[in-house]
Amino acid sequence: MIPLKTIEDLISKHSILEKELSSGEVDKKLFAEKSKEYSDLNEVIDDARKYFSYEGEKKDLEKILSDSNSDNEFKEMAEVELKDLKLENETIEKKLKLFLLPKDEADKKNAIIEIRAGTGGLEASLFAADLFKMYEKVSHQKKWELELISMSQSEAGGLKEVIASIRGKNIYSTLKYESGVHRVQRVPDTETQGRVHTSAATVAVLPEAEEVDIKINDSDLRIDVFRAGGPGGQSVNTTDSAVRITHIPTGLSVSQQDQKSQHKNKAKGMLILRSRLYELERSRIEGERSEDRKSKIGTGDRSERIRTYNFPQGRVTDHRINLTLHKLEAFLEGEAFDEMVENLTLQAQEEKLSNLN
């Protein structure tokens, strides 16, 4: 049960914001923030008022049921109404609890997605390319903006590594559950005996950090420049346009050479480094929470096997929630992606509610 004082404060806050915004006297610097807060409260204010009045309505109906002077027909009506009221209140309570859960500010951010071929040689790099194509299709369907940051190709159209930024609305909240090891089971084109091979690729999804999110001192950076190299060490640029940025305190290092301009390579390298440092700090804070409150979903552990794509059986299985979708082709086309994300989000919310209780 949610303390009524909490609900009362929520209703009061809505009323105060409503008066402030309608008065036209709100500080311009705070107007957008207060408008957003008011808009968020608007989504649950009716439910909050119903929840606040629930106990009184319930007592009135229980009084009718216990009154020996009430006729049977009236009691039957009160009994049905009480049952409906309790069911409605349970739904409202769950919605309000979700609203009151601590918000992850990173959910609203854009994302950096990094995909790397894992065990499995050529087949792993081909699978990494398949995953990248899937995220490209999802981005296109949702009208997100996907920008390639760097790409390292292998033979036969595979990818050793690819890094991209994805921009749009609530990107990180949608993609954050993709971090981990993705495993594929299929018969490679080169397999003459028809045997199923298993290979893997790792996916890391980071919230795209802005300069205000994390402070990086220039003195903590070592920047090396060198000539960009092509396949087999072949020089593709006669100027020192490639950049390697090392964050000395953590040892994190980012190399960027996809652009012809040293300035652009440095800017993209800093974007990746900033996002990795931001995620490192988020992970440190998360690690300070007690073990029993850590979520099994969305931990972002890159070594955790999260999903298997089985081509012979046409299925994709997410091991964190034991969900299997027998629509592998549609999933890789981005068409069944939302179904998986919705189930992961629901389970993560259930875990948070359980911890709240």
UniProtKB/Swiss-Prot annotation:
The keyword Oxidoreductase does not apply. GO terms for cellular component: cytoplasm. Belongs to the prokaryotic/mitochondrial release factor family. InterPro entries: PCRF, Pep_chain_release_fac_I, Pep_chain_release_fac_I_sf, Prokaryotic/Mito_RF, RF-1. Methylated by PrmC. Methylation increases the termination efficiency of RF1. This is Peptide chain release factor 1. GO terms for molecular function: translation release factor activity, codon specific. It holds the Pfam family RF-1. Keywords: Cytoplasm, Methylation, Protein biosynthesis. The keyword Ion transport does not apply. It comes from Pelagibacter ubique (strain HTCC1062). Peptide chain release factor 1 directs the termination of translation in response to the peptide chain termination codons UAG and UAA. Gene3D superfamilies: 3.30.160.20, 3.30.70.1660, 6.10.140.1950. It comes from the Bacteria. Residues 284-304 are annotated as: Disordered. The modification N5-methylglutamine is found at residue 234. Its main location: cytoplasm. It is found in: Cytoplasm.
